[in-house]
């Protein structure tokens, strides 16, 4: 008598996905992305002009790397969340969890940019319409 292993059917193939709407494909910047990009552009311009305030701001931002945004109140005015809050419609008050997530994302983005920018003052480390982080990592 021979034993045969039970036949396991192959996994079902997922149905073909419908194309994403053009608004999703376009990678339209949301209010958080716009706020962070504007803050970084301002800091970057000032840093390249050797503004003492920008040099100090980048030094402070670098100290925030690896720390939670809630642990670094000295950075709260440097990250650029003010523009994000101003862009929120009056009839939409984001949940506390959404706000915390946005603050954390902005904190990580700006502090890591500050570290990266320090490596080469003459070169702009943040470029508009440049490769996304995922694209850059794949290269």
Residue ranges of model-derived segments:
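The feature captures two recurrent sequence modes
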Residues: 2-93
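Aromatic- and glycine-enriched beta-alpha-beta binding-site module
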Residues: 87-136
């Amino acid at each position: 008598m021979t034993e045969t292993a039970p036949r396991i059917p192959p996994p079902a193939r997922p149905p073909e996905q419908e194309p994403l709407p053009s608004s999703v494909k376009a990678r339209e910047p949301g209010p958080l992305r716009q706020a962070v990009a504007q803050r970084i552009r301002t800091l970057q311009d000032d840093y390249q002009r050797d503004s003492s305030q920008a040099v100090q701001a980048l030094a402070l931002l670098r100290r925030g790397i690896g720390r939670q945004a809630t642990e670094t109140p000295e950075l709260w005015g440097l990250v650029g969340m003010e523009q994000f809050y101003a862009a929120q419609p009056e009839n939409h008050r984001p949940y506390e969890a959404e706000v915390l997530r946005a603050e954390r994302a902005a904190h990580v983005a700006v502090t890591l940019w500050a570290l990266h920018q320090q490596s080469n003052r003459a070169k702009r480390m943040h470029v508009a319409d440049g490769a996304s982080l995922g694209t850059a990592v794949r290269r």
